[in-house]
Amino acid sequence: MKLTCVLIITVLFLTASQLITADYSRDQRQYRAVRLGDEMRNFKGARDCGGQGKGCYTQPCCPGLRCRGGGTGGGVCQP
């Protein structure tokens, strides 16, 4: 009888602690996703692109342009 009561109390305690922990971690993930989205939006590589005639050795070309050339100095963004 005592063992049964101890087991029931233990199960209730573990269930309650898991519910509390799950509720806390769910909120943390939500904030983490928002923070990661902000970091992706402000990432320097995501913002900068080379316009027509600009070098594409250190940064990618803007949409609609391709990196042409090469050699020792790198390529140039051209349509």
From Swiss-Prot:
Pfam families: Conotoxin. InterPro entries: Conotoxin. It is found in: Secreted. Keywords: Disulfide bond, Knottin, Secreted, Signal, Toxin. Residues 23-47 form a propeptide. One of its GO terms (cellular component) is extracellular region. It comes from the Eukaryota. Residues 1-22 form the signal peptide. One of its GO terms (molecular function) is toxin activity. Belongs to the conotoxin O1 superfamily. The presence of a 'disulfide through disulfide knot' structurally defines this protein as a knottin. The cysteine framework is VI/VII (C-C-CC-C-C). This is Conotoxin 12. It comes from Conus vexillum.
